[in-house]
């Protein structure tokens, strides 16, 4: 009887914790936290760079202490008084990608990173952790935020960047809010930017499951102006003065288009409800990049703009991995072959039951030969995550593998659907 009573007590406590509402812990505002991730391949550190308050909260108000995906890093917010977990989020970062390059073995660098958290009603402890490819802790730090701290910068009440909604399905509290920003567009070119943003929006919702779940999204185009037209192309010696200082040749890969000026992105969005970010670069050069829960950045005037913006959003929103691979790829060793990746669309088969094993038709050969892709639309095809051997993808082709294939594969569709449901249901 005593054991039963103890079990009942624990169960009730767990249910009570799960049922606590957003309003018990948070105001309807956003705590923006800026960090600097710094270090090299041997040692990494996390530094707090600043705190800001934004006038509203556009993120989820349920599943507060759960994660949709593990990511390459995590933030846990706890009530400082009793230590209970009141919010979690996960992410990846350009810094962690850089740590796997040869340059990181020789020099120390710092990278900006910004995260949006619900604004606590009472003092809260924030713990941020960076993980390595083997899921070991690389760096971690804790700090306490007091909501009445006078040095928390108030932003988003004035000087708001001009913007217009391309899709407004409902209240920001219930919908997923995606902001599309201009990069390399002068004030005179903003009509072109709005046209490009509309194409990006149209392209996204031409794909399942975004098409059938369109009602869950708000899309806002934000006219962030640049001094120069175009973006920087280092291999051509071209350096432009743009809103977010983006450039190609990230990590000396010609087509990898990114920015390390993350704070400027969020400054441009202050006062506009947003959760996820797409940045359009005013250039005909081919390239792009997508970082989970950070941003998508893609060229807007290359012929492959439409498929690339969707592919990169698959990274930044859906947490999907690249399914392509090349012989002698410099990123071949990105994923250890004895560790199951957290991304839902690739597998080392170490923990395949957690991936798409349940979606395989009876009798599907494992591995699945590419020659039988017509028979097995969902299989276990070798070659993914930049490696030709030891990593598997769920379909012979997919939007996450090539620009030419018109759709996400069934496994990627399910993964994206689950993320949308996590944020909205």
Which sequence ranges carry the predicted segments?
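Beta-strand-enriched, solvent-exposed domains that form extended recognition/catalytic surfaces
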Residues: 25-151
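Sec/Tat signal peptide C-region and signal peptidase I cleavage site
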Residues: 15-19
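Short pre-active-site segment immediately N-terminal to the catalytic Zn-binding motif
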Residues: 190-193, 288-312
């Amino acid at each position: 009887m005593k054991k039963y009573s103890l079990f009942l007590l624990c169960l009730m406590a767990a249910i009570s914790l799960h049922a606590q509402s957003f309003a018990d812990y948070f105001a309807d505002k956003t705590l923006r936290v800026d960090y600097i991730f710094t270090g090299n391949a041997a040692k990494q550190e996390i530094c707090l760079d600043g705190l800001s308050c934004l006038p509203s909260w556009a993120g989820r108000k349920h599943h507060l202490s759960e994660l949709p995906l593990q990511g390459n890093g995590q933030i846990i917010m706890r009530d400082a008084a009793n230590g209970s977990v009141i919010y979690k989020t996960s992410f990846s970062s350009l810094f962690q990608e850089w740590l796997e390059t040869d340059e990181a073995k020789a020099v120390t660098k710092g990278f900006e990173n910004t995260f949006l958290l619900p604004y606590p009603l009472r003092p809260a402890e924030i713990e941020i952790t960076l993980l390595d490819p083997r899921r070991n802790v690389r760096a971690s730090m804790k700090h306490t935020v007091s909501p009445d701290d006078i040095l928390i910068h108030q932003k988003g009440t004035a000087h708001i960047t001009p913007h217009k909604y391309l899709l407004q399905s409902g209240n920001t509290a219930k919908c997923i809010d995606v902001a599309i920003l201009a990069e390399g567009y002068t004030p005179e070119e903003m009509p072109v930017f709005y046209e490009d943003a509309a194409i990006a929006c149209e392209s996204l919702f031409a794909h399942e499951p975004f098409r059938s779940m369109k009602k869950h999204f708000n899309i806002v185009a934000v006219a962030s102006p640049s001094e120069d037209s175009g973006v920087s192309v280092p291999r051509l010696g071209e350096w432009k003065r743009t809103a977010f200082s983006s450039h190609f040749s990230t990590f000396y890969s010609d087509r990898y288009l990114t920015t390390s000026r993350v704070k400027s992105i969020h400054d441009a969005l202050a006062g506009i409800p947003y959760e996820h970010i797409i940045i359009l670069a005013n250039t005909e050069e081919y390239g792009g990049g997508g970082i989970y829960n950070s941003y998508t950045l893609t060229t807007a005037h290359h012929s492959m703009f439409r498929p690339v913006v969707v592919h990169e959003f698959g990274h930044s929103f859906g947490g999907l991995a690249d399914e392509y691979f090349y012989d002698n790829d410099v990123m071949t060793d990105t994923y250890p072959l004895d560790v199951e990746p957290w991304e839902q669309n690739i597998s080392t088969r170490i923990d395949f039951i957690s991936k798409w094993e349940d979606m395989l038709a009876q009798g599907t050969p494992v591995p699945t030969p590419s020659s039988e892709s017509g028979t097995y639309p969902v299989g276990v095809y070798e070659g993914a995550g930049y490696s030709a051997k030891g990593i598997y993808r769920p379909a012979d082709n997919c939007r996450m593998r090539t620009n030419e294939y018109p759709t996400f594969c069934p496994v990627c569709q399910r993964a994206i659907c689950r993320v949308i449901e996590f944020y909205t249901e």
